[in-house]
Structures are given as C-alpha cells and as structure tokens.
Amino acid sequence: MVAGGGERVVVHPEGWNRSPNPYSYAIRSGDTLFLSGLVARDVHANTAVQGDVAAQLDVIMRNGADILRAAGLGFDDVVSAKVFLADAADFSAMNAAYRARFGSRPPARATVRAALASPSHTVEVTMVAVAGAKEAVSTGGRPNPNLSAAIRAGDRLYVSGMLGAADQTRGDAGAQTREALARIDTTLTAAGFSRADVVEGLVYLTDFAHYGAMNDAYRAFFGKDFPARATVGAGLFNPDGLVEIMVTAVKAP
C-alpha cells in the first residue's frame, strides 16, 4: 500500500514530548504517512484533555494537523480514517466536528463504538495520508458530507466501511455480508478496480455468533487468494447493522 517505499521515517512534530507509550505518532514511508490513533492529549505535558466529544475531537484534529504538517502534508492528503467512539450517543456531535476539518473530498472512513484505553477518552481517530494527486470515487448515490465512498491515490484505493443492512437483510449476518461486499464491488468497479485487487480487509461484527455466517459469505465472494484480514467485535451505528467491512485495494501496474 506504499508507493515509492523502502524508507521508514519517524515523524515527530517539533516541541512535542515523546509519547509515554511504545509507539511513534506517525511513520512515513515513501509518499504515505501512517498516523497512530490520536486521543485528546496535551502533547507538551503528556496529559489527557477533558471535555465533550467535540472538544476532544478538536484537540485530536489540531494535533493531527501538526503531525501532517511535520510530514509536509495536510488534511487534503488524508485518504482514510477510522473513528472509535466510546459512547454511541456522541455520533452526531462527532460528525459535526469532524466534517468541519475536511472539504468537499472527505477521506474514506469507518466509525464504530469501541472501548478506549482510558475512561477519560470519548473518541480516538487513526488516519492515513498520501502525498500527490487523489480523487474521490462516486457510485452515484447522494454524497455523504462525512466521508467519501472511496479515495483513489495512484494505484491504491481506500474504501469506506460498507454495511449491508436493509429491510430484506435485517437479522441475517450472511445476507448483510453479501450486500456489503456487493456495495464494495460496485465501488471497486467505479474506480477501475476489481475484487482481485483487494489486499486487506477489516470486518467489524456486533456479535461473534455471526462469525460463521459472515465467513461463508466472505469466502464465497473472494473465492481464493484471500486478502489479509482482521475481524473485530464492535458496535455499529446502524441499529440493524450486524457487519461492516472496510477494504484497501492495490492495482497491478
């Protein structure tokens, strides 16, 4: 997923304290910057910042801007993000604060409810940014102000988390997986990619009782030479949603 890679550069904004935990705030390889999960933290004092989700997200985005700037990038270069919320009730407030940071081409995104490392944290955000030309991929539906269906950056495609919840799939994890993958397939095709180009997937499940049904549908979709994958238990923000799937694809030269 890295063009022009081979290097591994730690990105650390000037004047910031080192994280007390064993990670770097960001790593740059070639044209791609991988940011660690950011929480509301005073990076000079290494202390948590209290406040509601909007206040905490503001701190996260200001810190994110510093990291991006240190790598010669900005929010326009962010191609993919994952948002983790401690409380589902914060979803709307988070979205309002989040979209203020991005213009008409927000990154691909998945948002789930998850336990965070500290009870003082309400939200955590990870991001991937890529230098150079990028384009949002449209599948013809109504634009979502919070995310793009996918972002293409060179030979890579970052696809948002897709759900398969609908009246006809309610309560059926296998059917929802098939529908989510069909929507992913439509997005891949719109960008000039195919399912054979998918290199990694992330599956969120609301209940691991659905693991077998999800796996059966997932296996049938890809057939063979499966992409790398992680499957995680998390809360989804569609009340009927059982499965959400996010993928990255790389097109062969």
Which ranges hold each PLM region?
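N-terminal presequence-like segments and the immediate start of the first folded domain
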Residues: M1-R62, D66-S80, L85-V199, L205-P253
